[in-house]
């Protein structure tokens, strides 16, 4: 289980996260909010790339800073088409990331083959990443996020800028990961997270304003017709701080 307790984060005088607390058991969670709501800050704190000014991030009751390098084997992170090396082939990139995760050379070929097959990228694995389409780049990022079979997966805008067919393909791969994993997905594409999310987390101006199932949220906010209408109703007047 992932637990955040009373997380705060400031950028100079601006409060990016304000007393954020969450408990996430295994399942898929959609993190929704407008630009500047605090999504990126929250994701970076969960991944350990950013330290909060206050509060704790716990994995199975242990603070992540106490886990050190062990946390790399627990978490998988796919940023929004960042951190890729265009000159690398997909296979070479995954080998590099597998090394950082501590996967042994003996296990590496089988593990890379597994994740490539999962995202349907086996045939493209020997091509330079610079020749990939946007959807292929996103799939290779998801492949590196699931190297080593992590129990916590963080995906930042996994379907942004993709065509409808590719978005469906990515969504299906994310849904198939659910089970014993905690999967946190930040997105603006409401229709991509609605069918697969266990719960939706709504964040506005650095505060968590609600967390519930899609059905309960839509009922709670006045019988709105789906999550997209709910999103527009809650966030259309948002005047938030920097993300």
Model-derived regions, located:
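Catalytic Walker B motif of ABC-type/P-loop ATPase nucleotide-binding domains
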Residues: 153-157
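Conserved ABC transporter NBD signature motif
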Residues: 55-66, 70-71
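Conserved ABC ATPase "signature" region
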Residues: 95, 99, 106-124
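Conserved ABC ATPase signature
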Residues: 87, 128-132
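Helix-to-loop junction immediately C-terminal to a conserved catalytic motif
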Residues: 47
């Amino acid at each position: 289980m992932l637990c955040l307790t009373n997380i705060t984060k400031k950028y100079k005088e601006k409060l990016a996260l304000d007393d954020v607390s969450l408990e996430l058991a295994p399942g898929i969670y959609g993190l929704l909010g407008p630009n500047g709501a605090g999504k990126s800050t929250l994701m970076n704190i969960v991944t350990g790339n950013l330290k909060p000014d206050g509060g704790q991030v716990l994995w199975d009751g242990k603070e992540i800073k106490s886990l050190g390098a062990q946390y790399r084997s627990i978490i998988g992170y796919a940023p929004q088409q960042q951190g890729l090396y265009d000159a690398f082939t997909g296979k070479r990139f995954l080998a590099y990331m597998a090394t950082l995760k501590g996967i042994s050379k003996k296990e590496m070929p089988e593990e890379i083959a597994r994740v490539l097959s999962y995202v349907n990228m086996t045939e493209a694995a020997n091509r330079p990443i610079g020749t990939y389409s946007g959807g292929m780049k996103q799939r290779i990022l998801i492949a590196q996020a699931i190297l080593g079979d992590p129990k916590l997966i963080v995906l930042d805008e996994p379907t942004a800028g993709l065509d409808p067919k590719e978005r469906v393909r990515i969504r299906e791969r994310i849904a198939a990961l659910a089970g014993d994993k905690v999967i946190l997905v930040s997105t603006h594409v409401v229709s991509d997270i609605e069918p697969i999310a266990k719960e939706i987390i709504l964040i506005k101006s650095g505060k968590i304003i609600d967390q519930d199932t899609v059905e309960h949220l839509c009922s709670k906010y006045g019988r709105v017709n789906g999550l997209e209408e709910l999103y527009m109703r809650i966030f259309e007047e948002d005047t938030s701080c920097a993300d």
